[in-house]
Regions:
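C-terminal transmembrane module of eukaryotic multi-pass membrane proteins
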Residues: 257-346
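Non-catalytic, topology-defining segments of multipass membrane proteins
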Residues: 1-216, 220-258, 321-358
Length: 358
């Protein structure tokens, strides 16, 4: 007979893949920094200022509402800067920019706009705090992912512009030839079209086992910050950076919309702004600006920051809130998740947030 009192108990320990670690300690020890660490530091890409104090609010405290027109103003002003420089060059020289020069101008502007938006969001975070801040701080870039995050962010602004220039840039078309009368409609339709393709691709990534393995890294963060919008496997990043925008562009052309290079540039700035702010977790009621938000709001289908934040917080294989530009397709296909802090009765429309221009 076996002596059960002398039996040794063997406990199995499940070891986590080190590549899945979200531990972030690198900001406190500069001795091991690489070029990527210094880029984040010198460009000021941190969402949280270690020297500042982030306010913390309970979920029942009112959440301030954003003046959406200030988001449009910010995006359009920053999109207009390279267009104005391009126009000035044409006027001064009588020649248009070549392909390489156009790529250099617009891809650089893309990167600078993203850096400036990050600075603004850090300032807003110091003023208004972050969603679910009473339970958990925002995730930082993990020690194992610093280089990957920066390389993917650079790739976004680089390869999107390579694609746009290759497909749409015409040496005989200057910024003054932009289809201004179509631009407001194109901005709104493009975000909805991008979101249609993204919704189904994103939903399939969650529901299909062979695809989930390419998306799970992105869901290691439960309280993301904007830089972690690029924390994903290469297969996902390929679709995010070029695949989905290309499908949306083809759809727009099939609809008969002009969608030339300059209009696409402006649409890209709207999409990139929404991707960044949607991963910011800022405790403000606002999010993806669109020229058609007035229509989306009639169906409770506009997207605010909390929507994608909840997707990360509670989503894994089974999830909700798959859209990243609107809630239209989530609303149509029944995958909306109830808001917590951005519910209508908890929004303070008297306490308005203005997006700083500088």
């Amino acid at each position: 007979m076996r002596n059960i009192f002398n039996m040794s108990t063997k406990t199995e320990t499940v070891k986590r893949n080190p590549a899945d670690s979200m531990v972030s300690t690198w900001r406190h020890d500069r001795t091991q920094w690489s070029l990527w660490h210094w880029m984040i530091e010198l460009l000021g890409l941190h969402l949280i200022d270690l020297k500042g104090e982030v306010p913390v609010f309970s979920k029942k405290q009112k959440i301030p509402a954003v003046r959406e027109w200030t988001l449009h103003l910010w995006i359009l002003l920053h999109a207009a800067i390279p267009l104005a420089l391009h126009h000035a060059f044409v006027k001064y020289t009588g020649q248009n920019l070549g392909l390489l020069a156009a790529f250099g101008l617009y891809s650089t502007a893309f990167k600078l706009n993203g850096i400036h938006e990050m600075h603004i969001m850090r300032r807003l975070g110091q003023l208004y705090g972050f969603l679910d801040g009473d339970k958990h701080p925002r995730d930082e870039i993990p020690d194992v992912g610093v280089g990957k995050v920066i390389r993917e962010l650079i790739s976004t602004s680089t390869f999107r512009m390579i694609m746009a220039i290759y497909l749409t840039y015409q040496p005989n078309e200057t910024p003054s030839t932009m289809s201004w009368q179509w631009l407001p409609l194109e901005i709104g339709i493009y975000s909805i079209t991008v979101d249609f393709w993204f919704y189904w691709y994103h939903r399939l990534m969650h529901s299909t086992g062979p695809l989930w393995k390419f998306h799970r890294r992105h869901h290691l963060t439960k309280h993301p910050n904007p830089l972690l919008s690029a924390y994903a496997d290469h297969e996902q990043e390929f679709m995010d950076i070029t695949g989905i925008p290309l499908l949306a562009y083809g759809t727009m052309k099939a609809m008969g919309l002009p969608m030339g290079f300059y209009e696409w540039w402006v649409c890209f700035q709207y999409i990139a702004f929404s991707e960044f702010i949607g991963h910011s977790g800022l405790r403000i009621h606002g999010g993806a600006p669109s020229t058609l938000n007035w229509l989306l709001e009639l169906f409770d289908a506009e997207l605010v920051i909390e929507d994608h934040d909840l997707h990360h917080r509670y989503g894994w294989r089974k999830s909700h809130n798959y859209g990243k530009q609107t809630r239209l397709w989530d609303r149509i296909f029944g995958t909306c998740l109830d808001r917590i802090e951005s519910v209508k009765d908890n929004v303070d429309y008297e306490n308005r947030v203005t997006m700083p221009l500088l």
